[in-house]
Structure formats: structure tokens, C-alpha cells
């Protein structure tokens, strides 16, 4: 038998039988790529730094660090070989330090020594195979993802989910809807807007799709997550989080595994974090252990306002903070918080007193209940270095709710406390002032139990709903007209010494929900769920008429604008401008009188539509304005001019006849203006235009006229 004949024989069964374990003898070695390139004189210094860095996960053998050098250049090659005491330590090093930032300019790639040989063999195999150029997908232009902001009339959009149909429509006056897009079976369950309105998300059995642009087609991108149920965006739209109630299962077929972006470490996980730029998963998480009878809290992963950090808690145990750039645990360890119940990020970066004015921080707050002899605690923490800014110890605590002011300047923790007999409860409001030195705390003690509290956007005023029936053994909904609605304002004229004072409290109000306008000032109170109430109450905190309620020194003039009705209301949402508000009755809640209504901020009905199997309404969010403070001021000063333009547009939309007449007048005026400009130019060229006289050539003529205003005759005797 010749050598050529031997080449045709299949030895795969023998190779498999006598295969050598590549890890045997090398299991405790790792190879580090991306280390700093140094001259030979700095070898000892780099070895010491590497030993300290990699020694965090296990003991490195004596002389267990080898740094190879290039003889031609006399410098290191950027590789480092490290030997640990055990293979488990080496495996931990790969898991902890792969793709880890070593310093500002160096990111490390860490692999086992045996894996390097395996990848080299795969490369040699690929070299012998014929190269097949991968198919390049044709570029499809999506159009500008914020094209709706260029609408000449500055209108907002909203999405309607009716039966199996989903459509995006313009908010306009009139009876007919103007659709931007309207499609059958666009989603299998729900649709979601991203925080700034860039994307509309549709959910499907195989995953989610993101839509946008002027044409709404094709989908911008797809994310594969079977049986996805919940979707969440980070505030800056850098990350997308999906959750499925079914753990992730990898296919058995090797070819199918290559088509999905998941590996063995992701199997069994239910939460996936996606990078919207790369469209790849950055990390997967398992669900935290569930307590019996406890419902799932969403979102599970919460992001800082700048998308720099993300945090999640293991209920009752710890709080884990991650750096989103690598999705690695900050400082490689979690914050131990025995009994932790809830946490919330400040909605904006906070400028802490005593720090540089330009330096802003991501701050979060969490609370733990009373456990044994340990008091309940509210903790304020700076995320970057886990510095505790303020701790507040509390006693006899039944529950806490965290309420951040939207600019992060104030934090209110609503503390429900029980009496010593534990038969009734009352509420304390604990106010933290983050922009003052030491984060002082102000306590407002109330006799009633506060059921809801809401800060005014961009302001320091707030509103509470409370009730005097504070028995702890009553779980049902309160009877109608048992709530007290209270308005509070801060004494601004006293500066940092000012406290929050009551403006006015209204008893026997039938409401459980508070909805502030996005721009503040206007408020709607309503009863949602658990009641047949149909009333919406509209309030103005800065009424321009006479003051009726509250201290004259408080920065508020409260006025009740009126009530409106919507039977079976299940949700309410303001539009981004704060001029309109939508209420709707969802088929998902009940099956009677489904539909939606749109009101203006004063409670005047603008549009009403009853729709069978109506499911959801949602305004399209807008990104933060790019206008400067001066530009905003100029717009406010010229509101009358803008109002005339919009009134003209409204008149044109009122009827086709009015539209044609206004357009004709506008065209004739433009033609006359153009003719007049052309004529003046010709006269000027011919020298027939008399120059305007200088100011000194003007003659001032004064005329004195006597006018008889009244003629009276008096008879003197």
C-alpha cells in the first residue's frame, strides 16, 4: 500500500479513541494578550503589577509569570504567560479578566493555554479549506429615525392598538384621523415606544422587531428571544432588555447553534441585555429566586440616567451594580444589603454640594426593613465608588416608597409606620436635599396614611392622596369619597431654610392617581381601577386670576379648572407638549365601552372614538429639546405671532372652502409682493426713484387747534 493510499483512509475513529486531553498538564496556565509593551528594564515592574492584578482570583506560583521579549526590538511582545496553583484558579481568571480594561490604553484578552493550541489547529484546518466569501447583505437606507419631528405644524404622534391592527397617527383637529402608518397583525401581543420615540417595538413568538423612519419599513433590526413577554429600553436608548418566562434553550443541531448569538453559558437564562449599536447580546441573567405569592417586579434591571451603570437586586440579599460598557460587576463584588426590598436611581445626574460644579454623579437609593435588632434603613449611594452619602435609620416601619424629583434635587421617601399596637398606620414623609451639604433630611409627620405622592416635573411642589382609615387589617378598596387631596409648596423666599407647607387640602375626593403635565403646573386627579368612578379633575397650580387658597408667600395659586367624565377609564397619559391628555378604556381590562378620548389641559374634549376591542393608546415620546434658554424665552415673547399662524392652519382644516379661500388670498398677496419688489428694482435701475431726504432736511410743522368740548350757560342772579 502506497502513501497516497493511506491518505484516503479515514482514521477519525482511531483519533477519537486515542485523543489526548489538551488540558492535561496545562490546566493551570493562562495566556494574556494586550499587555503593555515595555523595554526589558521594566520587566520586574510589569511582573509585579500583573501578579497583583491577576492574584485577586487565586495564588500564582513563584516565578509563575513569564513575559516574552522580541530579540529584534528588545521590547515585550504584549503577551504574558501566568501559572496558577490550580486549574480552578486559572478558569476563574479567564472568566474574571477576559475583555477587562487593564488601564486607560490596554484591554486584556485572557485564554487558557490549551485553548490557544485548539484555536491554532482550527486555523490550520481553515487554511486548507477553500475560502468562500460571505454574502454581504445589501445596504437598505432607513431614512431619518427622527423624521416626525420635522412636521411643519409641530404635531405629536400616537399609536392605537385596535383588535389585530396597530397604527401610528398624527394628533390633529377634526373628525378624520390622519395615519402615518396602519397595519394588520403588526404585533402578536403589544407595542412599545423607546424613551425618546426613536423606535416602535413589536413583539413576536421568536423575538422583537424595531421599527422607525419615515416609511416604517423594513424593520430596523430584529432581536431573537423566543416567547418574549416584556421589553425595556435604557434611558439613552443604548441598550434593550428582553424577558421571557421560558428559559433559553440552545438547539441540538450544531449548524443552528451557529445562527444564534448565544453560547452554553446563556442556556437557562431568561433576561437578555442587547447592545443596540452592535445588535448583539452583552449579557444574560437568570431570574432571581421567587418568593411564594410574590408577583414579579419589572423592570428587574434598572439603568442610571446616563446609561453608564445598570443595577439589579437579589431580593433580601444584595444589590449588584454593573458597568454597562462591559456589563461586568463594579469592583467585582455586590453591595451586601440584608433584607433589601427596593431601589431606584435618581432620574437625572446629581450635582452634589461640595463637589465640583461641573461634576455630576449617578446616585441611587435603596431601603431595607427591620430585621431582628437591626432598624429599617434608607441608604443614598454614589454609584461610581459605592460611597454612602446618607443613611437614615427608621423604626416601626410597615412599608417604604421611593419618590425622586425628576431633576434629582430632592428625594421623598414615603414611610408607612405602624403604631405600637400595630392596629393602625400613619405616614411620615422624609425629604432628602441632595444639592445641599451633608444631604439634610426634613421630616413631615402626617396623621393619615398617604396612598400616593407625586412631584411636579421641573419643580419642588408635590401632591399627596391620603385617607384616615388606616387600619392594617383592611385590604379592600376604600369607599368612594374617602380620600384627602393635599397640595404642598416649598417656601422659596426663605432659601435653604424653607420648608414644605400645605397650600390646601380637599376632603372627600374620589381619586387614587395623580398625573402631572410633563411641563408642570397642570394636574389631573382620577380614580383608576377598583371603582366605577368616571370623573377626571383638572387643576392649575399657577392660576393667573385672584388667589383663593394658600399662603400668599407660597409660590402657587391653586385653582380648580373643572371635571370631565370617562366611564370605565383604565389609563391616562399626557402628550409630550403638555397641551393634550389621552384617556382610554382598554379591552385588556374590561370589555365594555372600549375606546379613547383626547382632552386639552383645561379638560375640554377634543376627540372621542369608541372602538370595539380597543387595547392600547400611547403618545410618541420626544427627545429633549435642543433650544437654548434664550430661544425658549424668544418663543414665549412671540407667542401671539405663532398663534396667528396656527389659527390660520386650523381655519384651513375646518373646511375645504375656507382652505381654498385662504390659500387664494395667500397666493395673491405673494404675487403682489413679488410684483412690487420687481417694479421697485426696475425704477431704481432707471433712476426714477427719488432718494429719501436726510433727517436734517425734514421740516417740523406744529399746528394748534382749538376744539369746543362743551358749551355751558350759567345764569347769575
UniProtKB/Swiss-Prot annotation:
One of its GO terms (cellular component) is cytoplasmic stress granule. Residues 1-89 are annotated as: Sufficient for interaction with HCR1 and TIF32. WD repeats lie at residues 183-221, 223-284, 293-332, 445-484, 506-549, 564-609. It is found in: Cytoplasm. One of its GO terms (biological process) is translational initiation. One of its GO terms (molecular function) is RNA binding. InterPro entries: EIF3B (IPR011400), eIF3B_RRM (IPR034363), Nucleotide-bd_a/b_plait_sf (IPR012677), RBD_domain_sf (IPR035979), RRM_dom (IPR000504), TIF_beta_prop-like (IPR013979), WD40/YVTN_repeat-like_dom_sf (IPR015943). Its main location: cytoplasm. Keywords: Coiled coil, Cytoplasm, Initiation factor, Protein biosynthesis, Repeat, RNA-binding, WD repeat. The keyword Protein biosynthesis applies. Residues 28-115 form the RRM domain. Pfam families: eIF2A (PF08662), RRM_1 (PF00076). SUPFAM superfamilies: DPP6 N-terminal domain-like, RNA-binding domain, RBD. Residues 1-216 are annotated as: Sufficient for interaction with PIC8. Belongs to the eIF-3 subunit B family. RNA-binding component of the eukaryotic translation initiation factor 3 (eIF-3) complex, which is involved in protein synthesis of a specialized repertoire of mRNAs and, together with other initiation factors, stimulates binding of mRNA and methionyl-tRNAi to the 40S ribosome. The eIF-3 complex specifically targets and initiates translation of a subset of mRNAs involved in cell proliferation. This is Eukaryotic translation initiation factor 3 subunit B. It comes from Yarrowia lipolytica (strain CLIB 122 / E 150) (Yeast). The lineage of its organism: Eukaryota, Fungi, Dikarya, Ascomycota, Saccharomycotina. The gene is PRT1.
Amino acid at each position: 500500500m502506497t502513501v497516497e493510499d493511506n491518505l484516503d483512509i479515514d482514521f477519525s475513529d482511531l483519533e477519537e479513541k486515542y485523543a489526548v486531553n489538551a488540558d492535561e498538564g496545562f490546566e493551570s496556565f493562562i495566556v494574556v494578550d494586550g499587555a503593555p509593551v515595555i523595554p526589558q528594564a521594566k520587566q520586574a515592574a510589569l511582573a509585579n503589577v500583573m501578579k497583583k492584578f491577576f492574584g485577586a482570583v487565586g495564588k500564582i506560583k513563584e516565578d509563575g509569570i513569564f513575559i516574552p521579549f522580541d530579540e529584534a526590538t528588545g521590547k515585550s511582545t504584549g503577551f504574558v504567560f501566568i501559572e496558577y496553583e490550580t486549574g480552578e484558579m486559572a478558569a476563574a481568571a479567564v472568566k474574571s479578566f477576559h475583555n477587562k480594561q487593564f488601564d486607560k490604553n490596554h484591554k486584556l484578552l485572557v485564554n487558557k493555554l490549551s485553548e490557544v493550541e485548539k484555536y491554532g489547529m482550527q486555523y490550520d484546518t481553515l487554511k486548507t479549506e477553500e475560502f468562500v466569501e460571505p454574502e454581504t447583505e445589501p445596504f437598505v437606507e432607513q431614512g431619518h429615525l427622527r423624521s416626525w419631528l420635522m412636521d411643519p405644524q409641530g404635531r405629536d404622534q400616537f399609536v392605537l392598538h385596535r383588535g389585530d391592527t396597530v397604527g401610528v397617527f398624527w394628533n390633529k383637529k377634526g373628525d378624520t384621523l390622519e395615519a402615518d402608518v396602519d397595519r394588520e397583525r403588526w404585533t402578536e401581543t403589544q407595542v412599545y415606544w423607546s424613551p425618546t420615540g426613536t423606535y416602535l417595538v413589536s413583539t413576536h413568538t421568536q423575538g422583537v422587531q424595531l421599527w422607525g423612519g419615515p416609511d416604517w419599513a423594513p424593520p430596523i433590526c430584529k432581536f431573537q428571544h423566543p416567547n418574549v413577554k416584556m421589553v425595556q429600553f435604557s434611558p439613552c436608548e443604548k441598550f434593550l432588555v428582553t424577558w421571557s418566562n421560558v428559559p433559553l434553550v440552545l438547539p441540538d443541531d450544531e449548524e443552528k447553534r451557529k445562527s444564534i448569538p448565544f453560547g452554553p453559558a446563556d442556556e437557562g437564562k431568561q433576561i437578555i441585555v442587547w447592545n443596540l449599536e452592535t445588535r448583539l447580546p452583552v449579557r444574560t441573567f437568570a431570574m432571581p429566586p421567587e418568593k411564594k405569592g410574590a408577583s414579579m417586579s419589572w423592570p428587574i434591571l434598572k439603568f442610571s440616567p446616563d446609561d453608564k451603570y445598570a443595577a439589579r437586586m437579589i431580593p433580601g440579599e444584595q444589590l449588584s451594580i454593573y458597568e454597562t460598557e462591559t456589563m461586568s460587576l463594579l469592583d467585582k463584588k455586590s453591595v451586601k444589603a440584608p433584607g433589601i426590598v427596593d431601589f431606584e436611581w435618581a432620574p437625572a445626574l446629581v450635582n452634589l454640594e461640595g463637589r465640583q460644579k461641573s461634576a455630576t454623579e449617578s446616585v441611587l437609593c435603596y431601603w431595607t426593613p427591620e430585621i431582628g435588632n437591626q432598624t429599617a434603613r434608607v441608604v443614598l449611594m454614589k454609584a461610581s465608588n459605592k460611597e454612602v452619602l446618607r443613611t437614615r435609620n427608621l423604626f416601626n416601619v410597615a412599608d417604604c416608597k421611593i419618590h425622586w424629583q425628576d431633576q434629582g434635587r430632592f428625594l421623598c421617601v414615603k414611610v408607612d409606620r405602624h403604631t405600637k399596637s400595630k392596629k393602625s398606620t400613619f405616614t411620615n414623609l422624609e425629604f432628602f436635599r441632595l444639592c445641599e451639604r451633608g444631604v439634610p433630611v426634613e421630616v413631615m409627620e402626617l396623621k393619615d396614611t398617604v396612598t400616593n405622592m407625586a412631584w411636579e416635573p421641573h419643580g419642588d411642589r408635590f401632591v399627596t392622596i391620603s385617607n384616615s382609615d388606616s387600619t392594617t387589617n383592611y385590604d379592600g378598596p376604600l369607599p368612594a369619597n374617602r380620600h384627602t387631596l393635599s397640595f404642598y409648596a416649598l417656601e422659596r423666599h426663605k432659601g435653604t431654610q424653607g420648608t414644605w407647607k400645605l397650600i390646601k387640602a380637599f376632603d372627600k375626593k374620589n381619586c387614587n392617581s395623580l398625573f402631572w403635565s410633563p411641563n408642570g403646573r397642570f394636574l389631573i386627579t382620577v380614580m383608576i381601577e377598583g371603582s366605577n368612578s368616571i370623573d377626571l379633575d383638572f387643576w392649575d397650580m399657577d392660576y393667573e386670576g385672584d388667589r383663593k387658597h394658600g399662603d400668599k408667600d407660597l409660590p402657587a395659586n391653586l385653582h380648580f379648572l373643572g371635571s370631565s367624565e370617562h366611564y370605565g377609564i383604565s389609563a391616562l397619559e399626557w402628550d409630550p407638549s403638555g397641551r393634550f391628555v389621552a384617556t382610554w378604556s382598554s379591552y385588556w381590562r374590561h370589555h365594555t365601552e372600549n375606546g379613547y378620548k383626547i382632552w386639552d389641559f383645561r379638560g375640554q374634549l377634543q376627540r372621542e372614538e369608541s372602538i370595539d376591542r380597543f387595547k392600547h393608546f400611547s403618545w410618541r415620546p420626544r427627545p429633549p429639546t435642543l433650544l437654548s434658554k434664550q430661544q425658549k424665552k424668544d418663543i414665549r415673547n412671540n407667542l401671539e405671532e405663532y398663534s396667528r399662524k396656527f389659527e390660520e392652519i386650523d381655519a384651513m382644516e375646518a373646511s375645504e372652502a375656507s382652505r381654498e379661500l385662504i390659500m387664494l388670498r395667500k397666493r395673491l398677496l405673494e404675487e403682489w409682493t413679488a410684483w412690487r419688489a420687481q417694479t421697485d428694482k426696475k425704477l431704481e435701475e432707471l433712476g426714477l426713484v427719488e432718494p429719501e431726504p436726510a433727517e436734517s432736511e425734514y421740516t417740523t410743522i406744529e399746528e394748534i387747534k382749538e376744539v369746543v368740548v362743551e358749551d355751558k350757560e350759567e345764569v347769575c342772579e
